[in-house]
UniProtKB/Swiss-Prot annotation:
The gene is ibpB. Disulfide bonds: none annotated. Belongs to the small heat shock protein (HSP20) family. PANTHER family: PTHR47062, SMALL HEAT SHOCK PROTEIN IBPB (PTHR47062:SF2). InterPro entries: A-crystallin/Hsp20_dom (IPR002068), ACD_IbpA/B (IPR037913), HSP20-like_chaperone (IPR008978), HSP20_IbpB (IPR022848). The N- and C-terminal flexible termini are involved in oligomerization and in the binding of non-native substrate proteins, and are essential for chaperone activity. Associates with aggregated proteins, together with IbpA, to stabilize and protect them from irreversible denaturation and extensive proteolysis during heat shock and oxidative stress. Aggregated proteins bound to the IbpAB complex are more efficiently refolded and reactivated by the ATP-dependent chaperone systems ClpB and DnaK/DnaJ/GrpE. Its activity is ATP-independent. HAMAP family: HSP20_IbpB. One of its GO terms (cellular component) is cytoplasm. This is Small heat shock protein IbpB. SUPFAM superfamilies: HSP20-like chaperones. PROSITE patterns: SHSP (PS01031). It holds the Pfam family HSP20.
Length: 142
């Protein structure tokens, strides 16, 4: 019998409350780049990516339907240094998140090597139930 760990997949879903709770309780390792997902209230979320060494022009954020994709392509140095120790990763990446319905990207900022993507859930206005009048109608004579 095989067991499959779905927590890495759940980490990519934002705006689903049950999955957000699973995210908070999941202690799984993260892939590059490391990121956090914060929930400030029921309608506001923030994704923070740690991108040391990247410049703003190296980054691209796209939203297609409910798929939010962040791509980074760092500029390659002319002369590759001879590393004694390389702890900072500077590699191209593409990271995608699936947003829940009614989630919108409200903004993105890049400060001190951290990319912040703010998300807002916009609940559609609920339309009150409509009462339908029942008219009296005489029976059809056949």
């Amino acid at each position: 019998m095989r067991n499959y760990d779905l927590s890495p997949l759940l980490r990519q879903w934002i705006g689903f409350d049950k999955l957000a709770n699973a995210l908070q309780n999941s202690g799984e390792s993260q892939s590059f780049p490391p990121y956090n997902i914060e929930k400030s209230d029921d309608n506001h979320y923030r994704i923070t990516l740690a991108l040391a060494g990247f410049r703003q022009e190296d980054l691209d954020i796209q939203l297609e339907g409910t798929r939010l994709t962040v791509k980074g392509t760092p500029e390659q140095p002319e002369n590759e240094p001879k590393w004694l120790h390389q702890g900072l990763v500077m590699q191209p990446f593409s990271l995608s998140f699936t947003l829940a319905e009614n989630m919108e990207v409200s903004g993105a900022t890049f400060t001190n090597g951290l990319l912040y993507i703010d998300l807002t859930r916009n609940e559609p206005e609920t339309i009150p139930p409509q009462r339908i009048a029942i008219n009296e109608r005489s029976a059809l004579n056949s």
